[in-house]
Amino acid sequence: EIPSSLVGSEMCIRDRAPFLTATFAPIFIGAAVAWNDLREAGLDSSWSWRMFWLVLGGASLAQVATNASNDYFDHTSNADEINKVPSPFNGGSRVIQVGLMTPGQVLITALLSIAGTVAIGLYLNQQVSGSFFGNTPILWTGIIGTFLALGYTGDPVRLGYKGFGEIAIALGFGPVMVMGAHYVLTASIHENVISNWNWIEALIASVPIAILVMLIVWINQFQDAPSDAAVGKNTWVVRTAEKGEWMKLEKPLRLYK
């Protein structure tokens, strides 16, 4: 008999895997800008597929950590338990609610995933700067990304419960991922000298995907709004909806449009 935790992990991966495209997109954008910069500098031969795959793997693990952490802390707040309209797009993965994984196993999944991200990030930093803890944009985007991943719904920060979750999503899937990928992949140009890094172009390129991923999260908050409001998860939809016997969502829907 297959242990339920393994079945739960498989279910979680299967249901969440399509959403990894939200990570692939910003990494691909950062890589595309990096490739163009290398080509213009006549250094396209320095392109490293190994570094690209490491960046993509580290970013993907960060999203897995964010999703698992969200499942765990939305369970502890009771938000997912009282959600009456869960779907593949909202209400969490449901592996805790249907008993396929314990809350502890989900938390361990989050911690192991973020540990993998940190390990990859430190390795990339060492490859670019010569030191695991070299003071580079890789280190700082890694620190910010880790904070956003675990602090999205995690105690004691709980950005998503305080109305900052949407901003955290935009930052994490926009500038953090795009600019982090770009810095790693253009190391042969800037040679770890910040003034040589074409960060403005990478930042501009990150804005559209930051907004798009944030809107994906926002539109799926409408279904969660009643349960989120009940546990004090003050998303933008909850904050802008009119309260009463029935929650009226016309105002946040107009804002979304």
Predicted regions and their residues:
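Small-residue-rich segments of transmembrane alpha-helices in multi-pass membrane proteins
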Residues: 24-30, 167-182, 237-245
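Solvent-exposed interhelical
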Residues: 69-114, 210-256
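Single conserved hydrophobic/aromatic residue that forms the stacking wall/gate
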Residues: 1-8, 13
